[in-house]
Swiss-Prot record:
It is an enzyme of class 5 (isomerase). A motif (GyrA-box) lies at residues 522-528. Residues 31-495 form the Topo IIA-type catalytic domain. This is DNA gyrase subunit A. Belongs to the type II topoisomerase GyrA/ParC subunit family.
Length: 804
């Protein structure tokens, strides 16, 4: 074989060859034709099945037979892509309106593969037959197949708006298409409206087409964005699975009955199982797939008291239960060019195609009716002169002379004469002649009708509307996908499963949050467990037990207040030290935390106590502008003084108890402390003895129920009835609260309790013990208490009370 040399720069050849290859993939493989909504392989499969006679009411044939027919005659590629395309057109979870009826295993929504083609069988659906109707009437151009031995349709006549109702997807070279499916009934209504109102806008068409209608149902949640998507032909559609909650005797069940289009059910279950395993804060107990022939049903069991909305939001955010359909309405137009069209453009192109198909069908029928009418007219002439015809035939030497004689005698054409000679004698009975006359009249009427179609555009439009209404009547069904507007952006709080956490801050500024259930409840007098892995020269300085959905107020030595959402703290294990406070709060170099207060969304005022005995009450709304990045002034600090405690109060009927390290305590009404601005210094709460200082303040609700819990640094503690602390005037010396601080050590904290709480005690070396408050005995006011924790050389630094 002689060599062929091309004298051309290789880069030029690469550009041209790759461009040809790209266009071949775009036009001949991956992008659908706007007229029938099919890619070449799909069109060839449907036409091949039509040629095999595989109609909806005929027996099915082996898929291998169909694939072989298509490959051998029209599609000279591998059998796998042909079979894959055939399978997809038969899957009810892939096609909104399947074009092939499959028999056997054609895969599943779990993405199980179909059976081999030698095992499965198929035939066309009725809807697919509607797409092929009239193809034999010269309604579309027929082109050569790959080897020029056969003809195949360039496009199908397609009475059905397949591209719109079934959508399409494909990846070509440098471009891709992704068109969502829609409801046939809605599409028909929109097409009819567009026929009557050619200037209609996309917004007007959307009165009928509400949005995509996926075969798997689900819910489109960004309805307000659909107008832009349909106007531009591109955009994002957000789809969520359909979920409801069922109440059981011991558990609640989150039930998923529909999933987003294109999502694997098995894959979704795996995703849910993974986050249930990896994220212990999500209380998912069990996941079951109860799907059957009646429909999909994925059951997620959660505790009776769990917040199902938070769990569902997490599933939307972290799994394919919420998915995105990225619309790109790229199609091949009738000039074989790739074009991005909007919704109206797709509909106009389809209507233009149907207009041309109906005209071509009318032209074909006009020719057929005219030819037949011409022949029947000749037969009627012969019937009226039957004697002459018989004489001519009997006296003619051969067929040719008989034809010539008939043409001359009856003044008919050669075609008519041939039909007369081919006519059987039985056609000359009076009944047959009457039938010919009726046929001729019918043909004249039909010719008039098709001529009107050829001459009047309005007649074509009328036919289109009738055909569309027929489709709606035969194949229309209710919408499956709900279209609505829902909140699709979550704030972080909507994803947080509420739980109690222990927030600790060390002397060196290491802040951490640990689930309270990490610390098992122990007996009073135990050794405790590690709360934080700190260095030898560091110690736990503050501890707060709160909900992870609430906030914590941090007050600094400069009198500034910062607010941090508790869920912003990374939840860690017990044996970690956490992250430095500066990673969360924008503190100045000389600024350090001196008090913490839990903000649970309730409360009216913040009470701040200082070491020197000052107390101040400020409305919480004064701190609304405080964030983790920007603090606000909370109190004016006098030189040598510092903040020791802060609490939230709800009512002026409550009372405050202020305690000192040397065992004194004073109780007075909240109303004794008037509200002040953030820049005020406060008023005197208690008159201190030399060397004494305030260590704690707490709030006592109205009434005389409950006890005052006192804990000292050497591990002693006691509960004393509230009524033993009589209400006094603010500013006095108070009452003796502990009998012998030399033995018990200085007082660390004083808290109001009811007896049904738990106490969390943290030592300077980072040990923690948690046990019920009820294990601490109720004794008198001037006593030393009982031993709460074995400390050794350690001492207690902070105390927190866990309330139900």
């Amino acid at each position: 074989m002689p060599e062929i040399l091309i004298n051309k720069p290789v880069e030029d050849e690469l550009v041209e060859s790759y461009l040809l290859y790209s266009m071949s993939v775009i036009v001949g493989r991956a992008i659908p034709d706007v007229r029938d909504g099919l890619k070449p392989v799909q069109r060839r499969i449907l036409y091949g099945m039509y040629e095999l006679g595989l109609k909806h009411n005929s027996p099915t044939k082996k898929s291998a037979r169909i694939v072989g027919e298509v490959m051998g005659k029209y599609h000279p590629h591998g059998d796998a892509p042909v079979y894959d395309a055939l399978v997809r057109m038969a899957q009810p979870f892939t096609m909104r309106y399947p074009l092939i009826e499959g028999q056997g295993n054609f895969g599943s929504i779990d993405r199980d593969p179909p059976a081999a083609m030698r095992y499965t069988e198929a035939r066309l659906t009725r809807l697919a037959e509607e797409m092929l109707e009239d193809i034999e009437k010269n309604t579309v151009n027929m082109i050569d197949n790959f080897d020029g031995t056969l003809k195949e349709p360039e496009v199908l006549p397609s009475k059905v708006p397949n591209l719109i109702i079934n959508g399409a997807s494909g990846i070509a070279v440098g471009m891709a298409t992704n068109i969502p499916p829609h409801n046939l009934s809605e599409t028909v209504d929109a097409l009819i409206y567009l026929i009557d109102h050619p200037e209609a806008t996309v917004e007007e068409l959307m009165q009928f087409i509400k949005g995509p209608d996926f075969p798997t149902g689900a819910v489109v949640v960004n309805a307000s964005e659909l107008k832009k998507v349909y106007e531009e032909g591109r955009g994002r559609i957000i789809v969520r699975g359909k979920v409801h909650v069922e109440d059981g005797k011991r558990v609640k069940r989150i039930v998923i009955t529909e999933i987003p289009y294109g999502v694997s059910k098995a894959g979704l279950i795996e995703q849910i199982a993974k986050i249930a395993k990896d994220d212990e804060s999500l209380p998912i107990r069990n996941i079951r797939d109860e799907s059957d022939k009646r429909g999909m049903r994925i059951v997620i069991e959660i505790p009776k008291d769990a917040n199902e909305e938070v769990i569902i939001n997490n599933l939307y955010k972290r799994t394919a239960l919420q998915d995105y359909f990225n619309v790109q309405m790229l199609v091949i137009d009738k000039h074989k060019r790739p074009r991005l069209m909007n919704l109206k453009g797709l509909m106009e192109a389809f209507l233009e195609h149907r207009f041309e198909v109906i005209r071509r069908r009318a032209r074909y029928e006009y020719e057929q009716y005219t030819r037949r009418a011409h022949v029947v007219e000749g037969l009627l002439k012969a019937a009226r002169a039957i004697g002459v015809v018989v004489d001519i035939v009997r006296n003619s030497k051969d067929v040719e002379s008989a034809r010539q004689s008939l043409m001359e005698t009856l003044e008919i054409t050669e075609e008519q004469a041939k039909a007369i000679l081919d006519m059987r004698l039985s056609r000359l009975t009076s009944l047959e002649i009457e039938n010919l006359q009726n046929e001729y009249s019918d043909l004249v009427r039909k010719i008039s009708e098709v001529k009107e179609i050829l001459e009047k555009d309005e007649k074509v439009k009328e036919i289109m509307k009738k055909e569309f209404l027929y489709l709606k009547q035969q194949y229309g069904d209710p919408r499956r996908t709900e279209v609505t507007d829902q909140s699709i952006e979550y704030n972080e709080e909507e994803l947080i499963v509420e739980e109690d956490v222990v927030i600790t801050l060390s002397h060196k500024g290491y802040l951490k949050s640990t689930p309270l259930n990490s610390y098992r409840s122990q007996k009073r007098g135990g050794k405790g467990i590690t709360v934080s892995k700190l260095s030898e020269d560091d110690e736990v300085e503050f501890v707060v037990v709160a909900k992870n959905t609430s906030s914590t107020l941090f007050i600094t030595n400069l009198g500034r207040a910062y607010v941090l959402k508790n869920y912003q703290l990374e939840t860690t294990g017990r044996n970690t030290r956490g992250r430095h406070i500066t990673a969360f709060l924008n503190l100045e170099d000389t600024e350090k935390i001196v008090a913490l207060a839990s903000l649970n969304g309730e409360g009216r005022d913040l009470v701040i106590a200082t070491k020197s005995g000052k107390i101040k009450r400020t409305a919480l709304k004064e701190f609304e502008n405080a964030t983790s990045n920007r603090g606000v002034r909370a109190i004016k600090i006098e030189p040598g003084d510092e903040i020791v405690s802060a609490r939230v109060v709800n009512s002026e009927k409550e009372t405050l108890i202020v305690a000192t390290k040397m065992g004194m305590a004073i109780r007075f009404p909240v109303s004794d402390v008037r509200r002040m601005g953030r820049n005020a210094a406060g008023v005197q709460a208690i008159k201190l003895q030399p060397g004494d200082e305030v260590v704690s303040v707490d709030v006592i609700p109205p009434g005389e129920e409950g006890e005052i819990l006192t804990v000292t640094e050497k591990g002693f503690g006691k509960r004393t009835p509230v009524q033993l602390y009589r209400i006094q005037r603010r500013g006095g010396t108070g009452l003796r609260n502990i009998s012998d601080v030399n033995k018990t050590g200085y007082v660390v904290a004083v808290r109001y309790v009811r007896g049904d709480e738990e106490i969390v005690v943290v030592t300077r070396n980072g040990m923690m013990i948690r046990f019920p408050v009820s294990e601490i005995g109720v004794i008198g006011r001037v006593t030393k208490g009982v031993k709460l924790i074995e400390l050794g050389d350690d001492t207690i630094s902070k105390v927190a009370v866990v309330k139900d």
